A protein has these predicted regions:
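Conserved beta-strand-loop-alpha-helix junction that forms the acyl-donor binding cleft
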Residues: 97, 123-133, 151
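Conserved acetyl-CoA-binding loop-helix of GNAT-fold acetyltransferases
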Residues: 92, 98-111, 134, 138
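Conserved GNAT acetyl-CoA-binding A-motif
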Residues: 113-125
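A short beta-loop-alpha structural element at the N-terminal edge
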Residues: 1-16
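A short, internal acetyl-CoA/4′-phosphopantetheine-binding micro-motif in the GNAT/acyltransferase core
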Residues: 76-77, 88-97, 125-126
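Active-site rim helix/loop that mediates acceptor-substrate recognition in acyltransferases
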Residues: 23-51, 59
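Conserved acyl-donor/pantetheine-binding loop and adjacent beta-alpha core of acyl/acetyltransferases
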Residues: 57-89
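Conserved active-site alpha-helix within GNAT-family acetyltransferase domains
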Residues: 115, 127-145
């Protein structure tokens, strides 16, 4: 098993795994997926390969002062909005689910976020997505707000404060 990190703007194969995951899941409400590939402006994609096959990927994005910054939803001031990192999306190949890859990728991304000086980690999860919710809670995220996001999809906004090196 190999984990690599690449710049989000250069990674189309991860998007293909996201598309495959979306097409396979039963409850489409669990997964906010944009069918048009638009790479995030700033961030990284973490990927796990098994024998050269992409089996899991995770998007970490830095929203800065973009209107999509989840910090706006919880009332963070502008200075703190600049310290928000989005633990954005995860996709795991169906034949590899249940092996802890979401947790592994989130931990790796968190290590990098701390080194880069970010202080607030945020993500959204459908409240009924038990597996993703358990993973986030296990990593210390708190459900700070539940509201409609992404064109009317209900989401729990998850928040975690970390100590940064900067």
């Amino acid at each position: 098993m190999e984990i690599i990190r690449v710049d989000n703007t250069k990674d189309r194969d991860a998007w293909l795994l996201f598309e495959k995951t979306y097409n396979e899941i039963e409850n489409k409400e669990f997964f906010a997926f944009d069918k048009e590939y638009t790479p995030p402006k700033d961030g990284f994609t973490y990927k796990i390969y098994d024998n050269n096959k992409l089996i899991a990927c995770f998007l970490l994005t830095f929203p800065h002062l973009d209107e999509e910054n989840l910090g706006y939803d919880i009332g963070l001031c502008e200075k703190d909005l600049l310290k928000v990192a989005h633990m954005d999306s995860v996709a795991v190949d169906s034949s590899y689910r249940g092996r802890g890859y979401q947790n592994i990728l989130m931990k790796k991304a968190e290590e990098d976020v701390v080194k880069l000086g970010y202080k607030y980690l945020m993500c959204t999860i459908h409240p009924d997505n038990i597996y993703s919710m358990k993973n986030a809670l296990k990593l210390g995220y708190k459900n700070v707000l539940t509201k409609e996001k992404y064109g009317g999809k209900i989401r729990a906004i998850m928040f975690k404060e970390v100590a940064s090196f900067n």
